[in-house]
C-alpha cells in the first residue's frame, strides 16, 4: 500500500539537524556544499525535478505543508522529507518571505571538453559578472539560443547562488557551466581553435557585421567596468551592439541575450 504524501513527512524541530544545517550553509554561502545546492520555492523544485536532478532532502515549513501533496508524488521515496516549524524553516532559507519548501539537489558537474564537443560551439564567457540577476539572465538566454554553455571566470558570482538560480528560471540546472581563470580560459579556447569576441560598448565590429558562423566564445564583462582590459587586448575580436546616444551601455544580461540572438540568427540562415 502506498504511503500518502504527508505521511512521508518527518517532523524536525531542531535547528541543529544535519539537513537543516546543510541547507542553511548552502543558502548563506551561495555555493555547493558537499555536492548539493539549496533551492527554494515550488517552481524551482519542479524545474529541478523536470531536469532530472537527484535530491538529498526536501523540507516543508508547517505553513507550507500543503505543497507536500503536489511535490512528494514527483519525488523518489528515498529522498528524505522533513516538516519544519516555520521559525526553523525561516532560519535555514535566505528569502525575506519564505516560500514554504526548499530542497538540497545534487548538481551536475561539467568539464571543459563538454563545451567544445560540437563542430561549431557557441560559448558565453561571464568575465567577472557579479550581479546574480545578470548571470541568471545569461544562463536563461544561453539555453534559449542553444549556446554550448558558459565559462565563469574569477570574480563571477556562483551559478548556485539562490538569486542566480531564481533569475535563470531553472536554466542553471540544464546549461553546462565551467569555472576557469581567465588565462586558462583563453589558452583552452585557442587550443580548440575557438575565436574569442569581447563585447565592448564602443569601437567594435557591429554584431550584424561580425561572422558568428564558426566556433565562437563571446566575452561579457561585469556591470560597471565591462570586460577587463587585459582580456579585451588578448581577445581575437571586439564586437559591439549598435545603440543610440547618449546611452553608455546595456546591462550584461541584456547585452548577452542580444548577441546570442544575433549569433543564432546568422547560424540559422
Where are these regions (language model features)?
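Structured adenosyl-cofactor binding patch, chiefly the S-adenosyl-L-methionine
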Residues: 103, 141-145, 154, 159-171, ...
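Short acidic-hydrophobic, aromatic-tinged amphipathic segments that line or gate anion-handling sites
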Residues: 10-14, 80-85, 175-185
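Amphipathic alpha-helical repeat scaffolds
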Residues: 41, 130-138, 248-255
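Active-site/ligand-binding-proximal alpha/beta "capping" segment
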Residues: 197-247, 251
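Glycine/small-residue-rich loop that forms an oxyanion/phosphate-binding "nest" at active or ligand-binding sites
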Residues: 73-104
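RNA substrate-binding interface of SAM-dependent RNA methyltransferases
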Residues: 50, 109-110, 114-203
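Boundary-proximal intrinsically disordered activation/regulatory segments immediately upstream
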Residues: 1-70, 156-157
Amino acid at each position: 500500500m502506498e504511503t500518502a504524501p504527508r505521511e512521508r513527512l518527518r517532523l524536525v524541530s531542531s535547528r541543529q539537524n544535519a539537513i537543516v544545517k546543510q541547507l542553511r550553509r548552502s543558502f548563506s554561502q551561495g555555493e555547493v556544499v558537499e555536492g548539493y545546492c539549496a533551492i527554494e520555492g515550488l517552481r524551482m523544485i519542479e524545474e529541478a525535478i523536470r531536469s532530472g536532478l537527484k535530491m538529498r532532502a526536501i523540507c516543508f515549513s508547517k505553513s507550507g505543508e500543503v505543497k507536500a501533496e503536489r511535490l512528494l508524488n514527483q519525488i523518489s521515496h528515498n529522498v528524505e522529507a522533513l516538516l519544519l516549524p516555520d521559525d526553523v524553516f525561516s532560519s535555514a532559507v535566505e528569502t525575506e518571505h519564505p516560500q514554504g519548501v526548499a530542497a538540497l539537489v545534487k548538481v551536475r558537474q561539467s568539464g571543459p571538453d563538454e563545451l567544445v564537443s560540437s563542430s561549431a560551439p557557441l560559448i558565453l564567457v561571464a568575465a567577472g559578472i557579479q550581479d546574480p540577476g545578470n548571470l541568471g539572465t545569461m544562463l536563461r538566454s544561453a539555453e534559449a539560443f542553444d549556446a554550448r554553455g558558459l565559462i565563469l571566470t574569477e570574480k563571477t558570482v556562483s551559478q548556485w547562488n539562490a538569486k542566480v538560480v531564481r533569475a535563470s528560471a531553472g536554466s542553471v540546472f540544464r546549461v553546462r557551466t565551467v569555472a576557469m581563470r581567465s588565462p586558462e580560459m583563453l589558452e583552452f579556447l585557442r587550443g580548440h581553435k575557438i575565436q574569442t569576441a569581447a563585447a565592448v560598448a564602443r569601437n567594435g565590429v557591429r554584431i550584424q557585421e561580425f561572422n558568428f558562423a564558426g566556433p565562437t566564445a563571446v566575452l561579457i564583462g561585469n556591470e560597471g567596468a565591462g570586460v577587463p582590459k587585459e582580456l579585451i587586448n588578448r581577445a581575437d575580436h571586439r564586437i559591439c551592439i549598435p545603440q543610440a546616444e547618449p546611452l553608455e551601455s546595456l546591462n550584461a544580461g541584456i547585452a548577452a541575450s542580444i548577441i546570442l540572438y544575433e549569433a543564432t540568427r546568422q547560424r540559422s540562415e
